[in-house]
Amino acid sequence: MRRRDFITLIGGAAAAWPLAARAQQPQKMPLIGTLMPSPVEVSTSLDAFLQGLRDLGYIEGQNSAIERRFADWKLDRLPELAADLVRRNVDVIVAVSTPPGRAAQEATRTIPIVVGGMADPVGDGLVASLARPNGNVTGTTFIGPELIAKRLGLLKEAIPGAARIAVLWHPGVYSEYTMAQMLHETEAAARTLGLELQLLAAQGPGDFDEAFAAMRRDGADALLLFPSPMLYLEYRRVVDVAKSSRLPAIYAAREFVDAGGLMSYGANLPALFRRTATYVDKIFKGAKPADLPVEQPSKFEFVVNLQTAKALALDIPSTLLARADEVIE
């Protein structure tokens, strides 16, 4: 072999070696950080999001990895948990509901953040507008304040003799602006319907018994729940206490009614959380949160549980049942 050919051969082999080595290196799996306000065992919305990922072909441990963080309803822990996800250098943060979304936004302005189930994204300061978020945050909204008056009207129609309505809410979940909007909508609807309101706060499931005892003591005729991640994710416990208190209630999601609650009016929340996964998919394919509009639900379900109505000795008007999307008999 001539010296020139030998040098060319060695040079070509040396150049090809790094390419071959690189080809053999496994591709880095995208790392998703999830931030939940709830305990690990209360994960209805997270499960729906993970199913959405699987539907899109993202299988944990095969082509994606997930770092999970849970705040156990201690909302003051969320900033610390969000900062930990940032230190882990996750590729995207998925926050379930507004409080984790705010904590993630304060922790980073560069890592993409997808928030599932926001109440009022603009009012809570998470996005500049629904059409153009203009930051590193986007996601889905279930539309919070606007539906409260509708629920109160349905409750009054179902129980025409009701005069005093207990309102259960979770303090600190939303911004002062959004909470003021919810209160304004509720009080305005109550005045129109001739109802008196009894506002009761619950910081966590441990407050349920005391809150419902106050409702019974003060003679509440029915119950309205403000939308809240804590109340939604603890829906079985809420329904159980309401049933034992013999208090008819209207809720923001059908899961309550499936568990034995009286009525619900709102978006299909599991479907909304599954849709949240599509944002992650688009971001992994190069889209920026600033260019992805916040998605609003296009359909709202009205569900009535007639078994619960009978147990409470309530005669739901046939005109109301005719408008229900589903009646559980």
Placement of each model-derived feature along the sequence:
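Short hydrophobic alpha-helices and adjacent helix-cap/hinge residues
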Residues: 1-329
